[in-house]
């Protein structure tokens, strides 16, 4: 088991933890349908950047 040789200072600990914060994912609104979706992902209706890329009716 690894054991540190010297005690980490509060500053070093906090600087390491500065990248651990959770942030909300960035959402986009589809300009044609108004649907909200993740950036660079297809909307639930199968539309990406104004074009229909997935035909939802063919799967069902």
Swiss-Prot record:
Organism: Pseudomonas fluorescens (strain SBW25)
A cellular component annotation (GO) from this entry: large ribosomal subunit
Transmembrane segments: none
One Pfam family this sequence matches: Ribosomal_L32p
Record-linked SUPFAM superfamilies: Zn-binding ribosomal proteins
Region Disordered, annotated ranges: 1-44
Signal peptide annotation: none
Coiled coil: none
One GO-annotated biological process of the protein: translation
Listed Basic and acidic residues bias regions: 11-22
Transcription listed as a keyword: no
Domain of life: Bacteria
Name of the protein in question: Large ribosomal subunit protein bL32
Keywords noted in UniProt: Ribonucleoprotein, Ribosomal protein
GO molecular function (one): structural constituent of ribosome
Family, as annotated: Belongs to the bacterial ribosomal protein bL32 family.
InterPro entries: Ribosomal_bL32, Ribosomal_bL32_bact, Ribosomal_zn-bd
């Amino acid at each position: 088991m690894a054991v540190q040789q010297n005690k980490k200072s509060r500053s070093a600990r906090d600087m390491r933890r500065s990248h651990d914060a959770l942030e909300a994912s960035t959402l986009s609104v589809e300009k044609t349908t108004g649907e909200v979706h993740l950036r660079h992902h297809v909307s639930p209706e199968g539309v990406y950047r104004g074009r229909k890329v997935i035909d939802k009716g063919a799967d069902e």
